[in-house]
Structures are given as C-alpha cells and as structure tokens.
Amino acid sequence: MRVKIVSKPTSQLNYTVEKIKNISNKLGFEVVDIDFDYVIAVGGDGTLLRAVKLGKPVIAIKAGRRGLLMDVPVDKIEDALLRLKKGDYNEEEYMLLEMVHNDKVELGFNEIGILYDRPEAIKVGISFDTERVSVEGDGVLVSTPQGSSGWGMSATNSLLYKDLNAIEIIFVNPIFYYLRSVVIPPKSLILRLEDKGYPQTARVVVDGEVVTLIKTNQEITVRVSQHKAKILRFFKLDLIGEVLHAYHI
C-alpha cells in the first residue's frame, strides 16, 4: 500500500509526520508523493480540505487547533494504520460542490460563494428551479452538510448533520433579513452579482480561498459534483459533541 502524507510544515507537526513515516515503514506501507492509494491528513480541518481534493480515501489524524472532522488521535496512529492494513474501518462519503465560471471549474468540500470585502453591500441573485430571490449584504455561500460546521456556522448558528443529503444557502450579514439560511435538496444554483446602479467587483470563494473575481451582472454556477470525498473512519466521530465543545456550549 502506498500512502501520501499531507500536513502543514510546522515543527510540532513535523515530529508527528516523522512518527507516521516510521510506523508506516514498520507496517510495510510505502510513503510517496505520487501514485498513492491513500492520503494521510495530519492537522486540522484546513489540512483535510487539501487532502480530500487529491481524489483518494483519506485517513484523518487530528493534530491541529480545530479538527471537527478528524477522528484519529495522535496516540492512536499505529492502531489506525494496522486496521487500515486489515481493512478494518468504515468508509464515509461526503458531498462535494463544483463552482463553474466560464471555463473554470473548482471543487469545494465545505462551501462556495460570492463575497464582498468593502464597507458596502452587494446584491446577489439566487436562482434554482423556478425560485428567484435577491439578497443584499456581504454575500452568499452555498454549503455542504460538513461545511455547515465551519464558516457557515459563524453566519447561521446552525448545523446540518453530516449524512443529510442537502445543501444550505447562507446569507452573510444580510440587510433587513432575519432569515439567515435556507436548506434545500441538492440542486444546481446560479449566483449572480446584481446591478446596484454602479460597477462592483466581488470575490468568488471556494473553501475559504479566492479563486476568481466577478463583476456586476456576471454569475457563477454552483452544483453538486458527481465525485465524492472519501474519509476512512477508525473511531466514532461525535460531530455534534465536538461542535458543542469547540464553541464552549
């Protein structure tokens, strides 16, 4: 079995990575950078975002400040790799989103959206099926269930259970709206930067990274990908409990 290790280059994590390499070699795994069978993500949720987009099953080792979706403690690494070798694990599949703009396609694990970072609002048009709405504020995010535990939660204070087959449309700091989000079945949406009477430019973000800019009257499509992120589970993941603990509730 060939594994790739993904982590941030910090002194604390470098020690953990070396530990994983030694255990992997002892158990007969080959640690490589290309042509791998599995990805070992070492860190927190940010590292997991990078790992799932490599297209292989992920082993999620919790070694960061915030890792709500990481299930393997550092002191259980050898146990997890032994079980990987035996095939003793549960495979969980997670929804992925795609952002389409012109010829550009970007894959998102948590959320995709349009945001503004100037001290004024933008108006975003949202279209799906026969629905057409406009929301004025700092922007709009479209979130997966797992994404609702991240950026989306800071805007809505709500959580979608990870097994729910749905997406959440999140209104970021909306003006004059008490409604903060809408949960809908997995559908293709169009997000459009609407005209407020003068030109504006907004950021298109995928998992917290700016991937392109759009101008007034331009739009992006957000759709559910045919691909799934696969995370191998060795220990019970108590997402609700982790969220309550992380936010000291």
Curated annotation (Swiss-Prot):
The active site is at residue 45. Keywords: ATP-binding, Cytoplasm, Kinase, NAD, NADP, Nucleotide-binding, Transferase. GO terms for biological process: NAD metabolic process; NADP biosynthetic process. It is found in: Cytoplasm. It catalyses: NAD(+) + ATP = ADP + NADP(+) + H(+). NAD(+) binds at residues 45-46, 50, 110-111, 138, 149-154. It comes from the Archaea. SUPFAM superfamilies: NAD kinase/diacylglycerol kinase-like. The keyword Ribosomal protein does not apply. The keyword Cell membrane does not apply. One of its GO terms (cellular component) is cytoplasm. InterPro entries: ATP-NAD_kinase_N (IPR017438), ATP-NAD_kinase_PpnK-typ_C (IPR017437), NAD/diacylglycerol_kinase_sf (IPR016064), NADK (IPR002504). Its EC number is 2.7.1.23. Pfam families: NAD_kinase (PF01513), NAD_kinase_C (PF20143). GO terms for molecular function: ATP binding; metal ion binding; NAD+ kinase activity. Its cofactor is a divalent metal cation. Belongs to the NAD kinase family. Involved in the regulation of the intracellular balance of NAD and NADP, and is a key enzyme in the biosynthesis of NADP. Catalyzes specifically the phosphorylation on 2'-hydroxyl of the adenosine moiety of NAD to yield NADP. This is NAD kinase. It comes from Saccharolobus solfataricus (strain ATCC 35092 / DSM 1617 / JCM 11322 / P2) (Sulfolobus solfataricus). The lineage of its organism: Archaea, Thermoproteota, Thermoprotei, Sulfolobales, Sulfolobaceae.
